[in-house]
């Protein structure tokens, strides 16, 4: 008779593209997000939590030629009902909320949201399928005063979490100005618009690569094209030389003062009404920020900001950290972008058919946290709990009473709940928990009404570097009356703070 096959055990591993977060990583992120939330609250924004699951229809992500949603989202179908998906950002749920509750929400509606999002994309080094976003948006405010406020709030948030002035810059541009440049370059003429739309798309993508490719690389893409790093030929926009000069002029229009920059942009947009409106909006944003005390050392008009210009409809902004760090190759590089946003006035239109003005910003949580770690500004790991050890199994209630006394005094504490047979294992456990103190009481100490207090941090320091005389003068373990337990532990914790 054949033996029944054993049921294979499941593999204890995270799915590809996902990871787990422990202790310090979680507390560091929470501390940073709490500080950002305080700033958003200070600026009058309210928190919003939406479901992690949305209908694919609400997210707006699907392939037009098949029944299955886009690979970019994690999606499934329940029987014959709608396709559902995990949210891929925090903006699409906001669009649904703004439309669904438009008769109940105040207008403008100011909200912030923080939480995980999911992308069904190929993972890579530092690129995961689940990550955190931190957004703030104003829906229903057509004035660029809302854009200026978001920029000011972003700068305030960066400083609140520990990024010093001089270590960051918020740069502001406007899609309308770029449209004006395209119009002055003859790319938006109605007679040739259909033919030029492809060229405009190539031009936007080319300008978006300015930081990486430089002037010559972008010029080649605006012209006939160029070979990329793999050797493949990338088709260009095939623009005339004067058109290329006009668009390159936009990407390099930043001057020594904001007034000179705005004058240069005015020249580049020519007679374009939309372009001139964009320049005027930038001037208005600059004036509003100046009135609040935000000068060009913190927030600056900079036409070289091009990320997102294919998506946003008006002002666009990006926060860049300017201090230097070592990259994976040991090279010294500027840290770079940690947040971006802008105006997108088509947010709710897909649901209601009516254009609703909106503007907002999204902070890259993981990147900003990495920056704080690089600067030594991330919240230091909180000490572990005080460990009350178990010397006598039949006195568990007494030990638990000690734990309760410590907790009543606001001291993080726990009772060792493993096998108490080997006392050395209890101290190993305390070390693994980063415990600052171990409390020890055997039957002899109990009879005398005392406890042994072991300063684990000092003990480690003495073991590592102290001489014999120093070891004798600074004992890491003291005997104190039970009544002094809380006071002695508090004193040790205060020394280590």
Curated annotation (Swiss-Prot):
Record key words, sorted: Aminoacyl-tRNA synthetase, ATP-binding, Cytoplasm, Ligase, Nucleotide-binding, Protein biosynthesis
Reactions accelerated catalytically: tRNA(His) + L-histidine + ATP = L-histidyl-tRNA(His) + AMP + diphosphate + H(+)
PROSITE patterns given in the database record: AA_TRNA_LIGASE_II
Cytoplasm in keyword set: yes
Source domain of life: Bacteria
Gene Ontology annotations for the cellular component aspect, listed alphabetically: cytoplasm
UniProt GO BP: histidyl-tRNA aminoacylation
Enzyme class, broadest EC rank: ligase
Family to which the UniProt record says this protein belongs: Belongs to the class-II aminoacyl-tRNA synthetase family.
Protein's recorded name: Histidine--tRNA ligase
Source species: Dinoroseobacter shibae (strain DSM 16493 / NCIMB 14021 / DFL 12)
């Amino acid at each position: 008779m054949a033996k029944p096959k054993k049921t294979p055990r499941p593999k204890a591993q995270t799915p590809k593209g996902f990871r787990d977060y422990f202790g310090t990583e979680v507390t560091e992120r929470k501390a940073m997000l709490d500080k950002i939330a305080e700033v958003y609250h200070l600026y009058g924004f309210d928190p919003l939590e939406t479901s992690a699951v949305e209908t694919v229809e609400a997210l707006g992500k699907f392939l037009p030629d098949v029944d299955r949603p886009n690979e970019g989202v994690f999606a499934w179908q329940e029987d014959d009902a709608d396709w559902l998906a995990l949210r891929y950002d925090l903006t699409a749920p906001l669009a649904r909320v703004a439309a669904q509750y438009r008769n109940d929400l105040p207008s403008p509606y100011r909200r912030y949201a923080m939480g995980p999002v999911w992308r069904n994309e190929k993972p890579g080094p530092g690129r995961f399928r689940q990550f955190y976003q931190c957004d703030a948006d104003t829906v229903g405010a057509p004035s660029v005063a809302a854009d200026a406020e978001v920029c000011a709030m972003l700068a305030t948030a960066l400083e609140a979490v520990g990024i010093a002035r001089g270590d960051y810059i918020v740069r502001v541009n406007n899609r309308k100005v770029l449209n004006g440049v395209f119009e002055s370059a003859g790319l938006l003429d109605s007679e040739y618009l259909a033919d030029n739309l492809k060229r405009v798309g190539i031009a936007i993508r080319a300008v978006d690569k300015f930081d990486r490719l430089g002037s010559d690389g972008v010029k080649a893409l605006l012209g006939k094209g160029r070979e990329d790093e793999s050797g493949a030929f990338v088709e260009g926009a095939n623009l005339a030389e004067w058109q290329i000069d006009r668009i390159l002029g936009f990407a390099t229009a930043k001057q020594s003062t904001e007034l000179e920059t705005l004058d240069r942009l005015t020249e580049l947009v020519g007679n374009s009404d939309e372009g001139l409106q964009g320049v005027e909006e930038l001037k208005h944003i600059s004036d509003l920020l100046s009135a609040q005390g935000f000068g060009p050392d913190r927030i600056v008009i900079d036409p070289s900001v091009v990320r997102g210009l294919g998506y946003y409809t008006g002002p666009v902004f990006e926060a860049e950290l300017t201090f230097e760090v070592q990259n994976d190759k040991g090279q010294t590089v500027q840290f770079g972008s940690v947040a971006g946003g802008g105006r997108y006035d088509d947010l709710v239109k897909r649901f209601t058919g009516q254009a609703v003005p909106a503007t907002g910003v999204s902070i890259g949580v993981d990147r900003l946290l990495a920056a704080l770690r690089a600067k030594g500004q991330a919240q230091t790991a909180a000490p572990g709990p005080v460990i009350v050890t178990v010397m006598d199994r039949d006195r568990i209630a007494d030990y638990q009473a000690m734990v309760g006394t410590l907790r009543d005094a606001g001291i993080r504490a726990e009772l060792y709940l493993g096998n108490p047979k080997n006392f050395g294992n209890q101290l190993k456990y305390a070390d693994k928990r980063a415990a600052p103190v171990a409390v020890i009481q055997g039957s002899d100490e109990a009879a005398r009404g005392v406890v042994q207090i072991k300063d684990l941090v000092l003990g480690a320091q003495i073991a590592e570097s102290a001489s014999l005389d120093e070891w004798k003068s600074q004992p890491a373990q003291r005997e104190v009356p039970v009544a002094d337990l809380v006071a002695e532990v508090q004193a040790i914790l205060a020394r280590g703070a």
